[in-house]
């Protein structure tokens, strides 16, 4: 990176490398003209960023994908990290795919998560009660998680985005 900065003639310019979640939260803070923002993106995974009450991003990663929100002994285990009860299992396209069979939606087991999300979103547009149950479950869990996150983050504003929040399902999550 330093070589690129030098080669491009940018070596004298200030720069900072930060997580994309932090950039999103900072953009949200600037857009809202407010500080104390927790940004959450429900997409391929669960991404997060935080702007404190003074308008600063912190030097740590706000990686809530693997932060626990479900402390039950039988909480779902993330296949990648091995973490149990973590946010990615509740607020991502993985969550939709995990919940679909429980809601009675049978999709091919080898169907990639993004495609499963699209199928559930299509069902949601037709007022399918099974799809609605998935989004209500995500919304209920999200409400509890936000209260839990507030124990660690001093936020007054919440920025929610990502593929899972697209369309009617996203409205249901926030209802």
Language model features: what each stretch is:
Residues 1-82:
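Phosphate-binding/catalytic loop of phosphoryl-transfer enzymes
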């Amino acid at each position: 990176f330093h070589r690129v900065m030098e080669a491009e003639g940018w070596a004298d310019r200030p720069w900072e490398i930060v997580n994309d979640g932090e950039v999103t939260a900072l953009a949200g803070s600037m857009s809202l003209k407010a500080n104390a923002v927790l940004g959450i993106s429900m997409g391929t995974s669960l991404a997060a960023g935080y702007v404190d009450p003074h308008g600063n991003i912190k030097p740590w990663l706000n990686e809530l994908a693997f932060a626990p929100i479900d402390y039950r002994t039988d909480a779902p285990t993330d296949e990648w990290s091995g973490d149990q009860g973590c946010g990615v299992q509740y607020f991502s396209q993985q969550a939709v795919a995990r919940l679909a069979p429980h809601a009675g939606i049978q999709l091919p087991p080898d169907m990639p998560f993004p495609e499963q999300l699209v199928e559930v979103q299509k069902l949601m547009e037709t007022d399918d009660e099974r799809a609605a149950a998935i989004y209500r479950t995500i919304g209920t869990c999200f409400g509890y998680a936000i209260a839990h996150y507030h124990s660690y983050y001093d936020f007054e504003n919440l920025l929610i985005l990502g593929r899972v929040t697209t369309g009617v399902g996203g409205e249901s999550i926030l209802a």
